Amino acid sequence: MRPHRGVLLDTHVLLWFLAGAPQVSARLIRVIDSGVAVFFSPLSIAEAALKARLGKITAPPDLALRLHDLGFQELPLTSAPATAITRFPGLDHHDPFDRLLLAQALESSLWFETADKTILALGLPEVRDAQA
């Protein structure tokens, strides 16, 4: 396994963090405050915008700007994660945004912080529970 160079936050974790929601664990807040490189994906911006438009969630229209203002780095999206999603057979019928975000984190040697029980159940060592 390659060394990890930072952390990628799942879309719901980004939104929770921005809102100061109690779902974000003290451990994750310490990680973010420690100065480790924190990344967000353009996939999260698209997912939040789409779900907000459909009325499923509330997300700020300037989400990317707010994340940049916090010092979070935008992780470039390449074709590698798009093909790597086949490495997770347990997610074949899961949300494609989630599969791509997970693949993007792993392909980029990042920890992936999520509260998605299906992803956490995969037992991947690079995946951390954002609520624990």
Q: What positions do the PLM features span?
A:
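Active-site flanking residues adjacent to catalytic metal/cofactor-binding acidic residues
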Residues: 9, 46, 115
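Generic structural signal for small/hydrophobic residues in well-ordered secondary structure
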Residues: 10-12, 48, 78, 105
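Helical cap/lid subdomains and adjacent loops of hydrolase enzymes that gate the active-site channel
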Residues: 32, 68-70, 85
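A generic structural signal for short hydrophobic patches within well-formed alpha-helices
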Residues: 14, 45, 82, 119-120
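ABC-type ATPase nucleotide-binding domain
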Residues: 51
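Active-site neighborhoods of divalent-metal-dependent phosphate/nucleic-acid chemistry enzymes
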Residues: 2, 60-61, 72-117, 125, ...
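Short, well-structured N-terminal submotif of metal-dependent ribonuclease cores
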Residues: 1-40, 54-65, 108, 121-122, ...
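An amphipathic alpha-helix/helix-turn recognition signal
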Residues: 6, 43, 99-100
